[in-house]
From Swiss-Prot:
Keywords assigned: Cell cycle, Cell division, Chromosome partition, Cytoplasm
Cross-referenced SUPFAM superfamilies: Winged helix' DNA-binding domain
Subcellular compartments: Cytoplasm
Region listing for Disordered, in residue ranges: 169-198
HAMAP family assigned to the protein according to its UniProt record, in alphabetical order: ScpB
Lineage: Bacteria, Bacillati, Bacillota, Bacilli, Bacillales
Assigned protein family: Belongs to the ScpB family.
Protein name: Segregation and condensation protein B
Length: 198
């Protein structure tokens, strides 16, 4: 595999890792390269991102991990994107993530990841940007992960007065909402959206 292919793989891995980032140990294991090769690839990718005005991303090293981030010079545009009201429909991943947060709040991203079986950085960012979810403090102990809860906008969007109005789970001891409850949850969301459009 040549250097350009390795850089493409590295870029894909960093994108998929999201805010969690990747350590050089993770990169060496996944890419099957040495520690020195990983550092060289990271340096080369950093030079490409950080040294070019036509790139919108930079490579950051934070707390021993590497992650992609947007350039500070583009912050005003990103702020506008987040502030512009959007009537776009939530993706299936975002809806599933929202249901997990609604039923388990307060909950960490890692706990949501565990229930869904995949990383949920993107869906959580979308839900926060749309005002349906917010972080409410941090977990005590190592890592100090953010705790996510639903907002009053969530209640409004689903036509609920309080969280007690959420559809009840078939088995109160169940850890995950079953498919019928998830369908009911999404149906209520779609109905409220249709009413808004009328």
């Amino acid at each position: 595999m040549n250097r350009e292919e390795q850089l493409g793989i590295l870029e894909s891995l960093l994108f998929a890792a999201g805010d969690a980032g990747l350590s050089t140990e993770q990169l060496t294991e996944v890419m099957e390269i040495t520690h020195i090769e990983a550092l060289n690839l990271l340096e080369l990718l950093s030079e490409r991102y950080n040294g070019s005005a036509d790139r919108g991303l930079i490579l950051l090293e934070l707390a021993g991990t590497f992650q992609l981030a947007t350039k500070k010079a583009h912050a005003d545009y990103l702020r506008k994107l987040v502030e512009v009201p959007s009537n776009t429909v939530l993706s299936q991943a975002s809806l599933e993530t929202l249901a997990i947060i609604a039923y388990r709040q307060p909950v960490t991203r890692m706990e949501v990841d565990e229930v869904r079986g995949v990383q949920t950085d993107g869906p959580i960012r979308t839900l926060v940007a749309k005002g349906l979810v917010t972080d409410k403090g941090r977990v005590d102990g190592a890592g100090r992960a953010k705790l996510y809860v639903t907002t009053s906008e969530f209640l409004d969007a689903f036509g609920l007065n309080s969280l007690e109005d959420l559809p009840k789970l078939a088995d109160p001891a169940a850890e995950e909402p079953d498919q019928n409850e998830m369908d009911l949850f999404f149906d209520r969301f779609n109905q409220s959206k249709e009413q808004e459009e009328e």
